[in-house]
Swiss-Prot record:
Annotated glycan sites: N44, N61, N329
Keywords from the named record: Glycoprotein, Ion transport, Membrane, Sodium, Sodium transport, Symport, Transmembrane, Transmembrane helix, Transport
UniProt cross-references to InterPro entries, sorted A to Z: MFS (IPR011701), MFS_dom (IPR020846), MFS_Na/Anion_cotransporter (IPR050382), MFS_trans_sf (IPR036259)
Membrane topology term: Multi-pass membrane protein
Name used for this protein in its record: Uncharacterized transporter slc-17.3
GO term, biological process aspect, one: sodium ion transport
Subcellular location: Membrane
One GO cellular component term noted in the UniProt record for this chain: membrane
Source superkingdom: Eukaryota
Keyword Membrane: yes
One MF annotation (Gene Ontology) recorded for this entry: symporter activity
Family from the record: Belongs to the major facilitator superfamily. Sodium/anion cotransporter family.
Species of provenance: Caenorhabditis elegans
Length: 535
């Protein structure tokens, strides 16, 4: 049995890989969700308010509208839709120039979800036939292209051209999770998957925690909102170059790694792909009828619906209900994500330690994690629904931090379950799960269109209550059917398991050669003496 090589080590190659995946996930998430805060800067709220008043009143009398920029966080603000005299409608305007109503905004937000819905299922075939590393790189290139041309499309061709471009971005998004899941599945043993996934998905929170203040600052500067798109594209291009020269889909293909780590991964993760495995059919019927898989599948739907709602619409809530200015909006959007990051990583490391020490089984670990996320989030949403308005925005921030901290354990719950049920079918199961997740994301704008007409506090209260009930429902289902164990239908036959053992051959110069069979051809990976690096 190979001795464990620590994950958190300067020469840990799998740590380097998951950090690269995390930064890449930050880039794709930021290019997708920064539009939420940027939209509040792009849109002329005053013009929209006037337009709505004319439609409602049937005339052009717009004297009933009061424009404000923000409220003083240290004092009672103007709550609801009426100002102090009870007559004028209060509108917070960030000085945008585009007149896009709520329907047009929701259509734009839904574009990426429509695109990803098209590609997420076919992604598994691409990943099985091509390197996940290259597939991910092409996907990010599509993100970059759409991001940098968006300002031109918005100002010259209108909202529908932006919607079409966002569909193009979504075509790339459909590959992001399946490719990263495949790479992480190749690099990490089951005892480290919760930690690895916690690190990888940090990119999501960093995109909001670091990205939101940056977007707010750029929007408020002379550069204006178009610069946010250009900055996002430039940063993603830098990551893409780094990824091309340093990343690998599989440990056996790495040219630079310590001998100790490679032996550890060969013994605990790396599996040879034999001819008998190449022709083995994927058990779709067993996958789609597995209670454990279906349990995490519905979680994927609801969690993505919730996350999309808060990623896209939280800046609107801060603007419409709490009446925050653009800088305060960016700050309030960022802070809960910082709590999420810290709690997620600490929880992921802690839960893996409990599994490693046999205190918790894999199944108990994912159920405890998911239970904390679901019921903790539900409780926080009830507090937000009944105890927060623009007179106490700081209280609202505290409740959001509580909710985001709770949601940090989702990764150690249903997401870890997905990668544990049948590791050899990770690409297929990830694609199916992401297809359902994309339906959840696509559902979000439709749900918001139904419940959010004018952006009133009452409308947001109903949204929070509905999300709270959905959290309870989804969490209860996972507690009944969820699992973190390898499923019986996914176990490899004994004779194949014996063939999984790697054959090491020592040659006279001290170099150790590992014979590794790839999906397409025979390949060899070279290792050097202990405590040295391969170049």
């Amino acid at each position: 049995m190979a001795k464990k090589f620590p994950l958190f080590h300067p020469f840990s190659r799998r740590l380097h890989i998951v950090l690269l995946c995390m930064i890449g996930f930050f880039c794709t998430t930021f290019m997708r969700i920064h539009f939420a805060l940027t939209m509040t800067c792009m849109v002329n709220s005053t013009a929209l308010a006037v337009e709505n008043e004319i439609k409602l009143a049937g005339n052009s009398n717009v004297s009933e509208i009061s424009i404000i920029e923000e409220i003083n966080l240290g004092s009672n603000g103007q709550c609801g839709l009426m100002d102090e005299d009870g007559q004028k409608k209060v509108v917070v305007d960030y000085g945008g120039e585009l007149v896009w109503n709520s329907y047009e905004q929701n259509l734009i937000f839904s574009g990426t979800f429509w695109g990803s819905l098209i590609t997420v299922l076919p992604s598994m075939f691409f990943i099985e036939r091509f390197s996940p590393r290259h597939v991910l790189q092409i996907s990010v290139a599509l993100y970059i292209l759409v991001t940098v041309i968006t300002p031109f499309l918005a100002t010259h061709f209108g909202y529908f051209s932006v919607f079409l471009a966002r569909i193009g971005m979504g075509l790339g998004e459909g590959f992001v999770f399946p490719t990263n899941n495949a790479i992480i599945g190749n690099w990490f043993p089951s005892s480290e998957k919760s930690t690895a996934l916690s690190i990888f998905t940090l990119g999501n929170q960093i995109a909001s925690a670091a990205g939101s203040p940056m977007v707010a600052a750029v929007c408020a500067s002379d550069l204006g909102w178009p610069a946010t798109f250009y900055f996002a594209g430039i940063f993603a291009t830098g990551w893409s170059i780094l990824w091309f020269f340093t990343a690998s889909s599989h440990p056996a293909k790495v040219k630079m790694m310590t001998k100790k780590e490679k032996e550890y991964l060969l013994a605990n993760v790396v599996k040879k792909v034999h001819k008998s495995e190449k022709t083995r059919s994927i058990p779709y019927s067993k996958i789609l009828t597995s209670p454990a898989f279906l349990g995490q599948l519905q979680c994927h739907f609801f969690v993505n619906l919730f996350m999309t709602l808060f990623q896209i619409y939280l800046p609107s809530y801060f603007k419409e209900v709490l009446h925050l200015g653009v800088i305060a909006n960016g700050t309030f959007t960022a802070i809960p994500n910082i709590f999420n990051m810290i709690f997620k990583v600490v929880w992921g490391i802690g839960i893996d330690k409990l599994k490693e020490n046999k205190i918790l089984s894999n199944t108990k670990a994912v159920k405890v994690s998911h239970g904390v996320a679901s019921f903790g989030s539900s409780f926080s949403l009830i507090l937000l629904a009944f105890f927060v308005d623009c007179s106490n925005p700081t209280t609202g921030l505290i409740f959001f931090c509580l909710m985001y901290s709770s949601m940090g354990t989702f990764v150690s719950g249903f997401y870890t379950s997905l990668l544990s049920l049948a590791p050899q079918y990770t690409a297929t199961m990830s694609a199916i799960s992401m297809f359902v997740a994309m339906i959840g994301r696509l559902t979000t704008p439709a749900v918001m269109s139904m419940f959010r007409k004018d952006g009133t506090a009452a409308e947001w209260q109903n949204i929070f209550i509905g999300c709270s009930l959905a959290h309870i429902f989804s969490g209860s289902i996972f507690l009944l059917f969820g699992s973190g164990e390898l499923q019986d239908w996914a176990k490899v036959e004994d004779d194949q398991e014996m063939n999984e053992k790697e054959k090491l051959k020592t040659i006279e110069n001290g170099i150790v050669v590992v014979e590794e069979v790839d999906v397409k051809n025979e390949m060899s990976a070279t290792l050097v003496k202990e405590d040295s690096l391969c170049l």
